[in-house]
Amino acid sequence: MKTIIEPFRIKSVEPIRMTTREERARLLEAAGFNLFKLHSDDVIIDLLTDSGTSAMSAAQWGAVMTGDESYAGAPSFYRFEAAVKDLMDFTHIIPAHQGRAAEHLLFSLIAKTGDLIPSNTHFDTTRGNIEAMGAEALDLPIAEGRVPSLDHPFKGNMDLAALERVLTEEGGRIPAVMMTITNNAGGGQPVSLENIRGAARLAKAHGKAFYIDGCRFAENAWFIKLREEGQKDRSIKEIVRETFALADGMTMSAKKDAFANIGGWLALNNDALAERARTLLIQTEGFPTYGGLAGRDLDAIAQGLKEIIDEDYLRYRVRTNAYIAERLDAMGVPVVKPAGGHAVFIDARAFLPHIPPLEYPGQALTCAMYETGGIRACEIGTVMFGRKPDGTEAPGAMDLVRLAMPRRVYTQSHADYVVEVLEDVAATKDTLKGLRIVKEPPMMRHFTAAFERL
């Protein structure tokens, strides 16, 4: 059949509270034009993030009831550990309450002031945790990855020539190489298996550890199966296992490709580093067999990892975003091509060329989407990445707006509504104005900054 349907039936529902444009204008101003500060029940379609917002399955809710809450040695942990190792066979699996906690553990142990950590593109919390240690987070995407309108099968790839040059010239400052799959800040774009192999090979040749931020590993594996030569006949599980076999460790948010509402882990092969990580975990997260999580959450993650590699689900997941992107592109809204795995990314800089980057076109567009139709989206651009560690500001590499689709939550009619709202925004886009920041924290400002319209 030509139509790809949602490969699930809906067993439980939550009502959406409808709001008026007048209400939304008032709420937006009260929130300082920062959509993170809105109450979620004032949002009609919430595309702020796909992290922790998935609909859990009946099997996951059933697993919740089997959770054991023993402080140490709970069977929930061992079921969780086995499920992780079934896909990512690292020696040590260390649970944490979410991905950024796993990042904090890792970078607290391997990074120090003056260090440099290259990646295809670090996302916000990864960058924040690196910079919190006084180190520098360096992005090395391929050139194609910086051109939103360019169609390329693996725009999330790392520039391997640039990586080799940095490793040669700055090797003394580099404790490790990171790879983010998929490349979230670059538009949810996949990384090829060949590119992961190449980065791992270079890291090993220079005596550096190679770590993967694996938040959307299943979506990345699906793109590899679809697009990479020699991969179409392999299972998702086979591709996933090879991907992580190339790494010395990984950080993970189970709130993405494990369908969980909370949770994550740090996985390592280095025994000494794992021992230090567990000691730090006890100080900051909890005992190593729960890591700040309830046993029921560990069981929900274990079940979610079995479900995430289902090809019918992945086909539907990726096609949903492609459908929205194709409709937006057809009506002249510039989008990152091809569509990402977890989200559609709008090129706000191209959509609103009259708003300069330092007046935050991405933030202006997110505000317009909410005011027009109650859609909450996320700026991935100069607000998120424009502030430098020394306090100066420069335009981000791109100014994007991310429409992150929660897993198994919305239907095609919701997707059609999103397109219609953007059609209305496009009709009056020339009247939109930029913003200025009136209050911001010193780090990861996009979460709590306050704005005013110019």
Swiss-Prot record:
The modification N6-(pyridoxal phosphate)lysine is found at K256. The keyword Cytoplasm does not apply. Its cofactor is pyridoxal 5'-phosphate. Its EC number is 4.1.99.1. Pfam families: Beta_elim_lyase (PF01212). It catalyses: L-tryptophan + H2O = indole + pyruvate + NH4(+). Keywords: Lyase, Pyridoxal phosphate, Tryptophan catabolism. Pathway: Amino-acid degradation; L-tryptophan degradation via pyruvate pathway; indole and pyruvate from L-tryptophan: step 1/1. GO terms for molecular function: tryptophanase activity. Homotetramer. HAMAP family: Tryptophanase. PANTHER family: BETA-ELIMINATING LYASE-LIKE PROTEIN-RELATED (PTHR32325), TRYPTOPHANASE (PTHR32325:SF4). Belongs to the beta-eliminating lyase family. This is Tryptophanase. The lineage of its organism: Bacteria, Pseudomonadati, Pseudomonadota, Alphaproteobacteria, Hyphomonadales. The gene is tnaA.
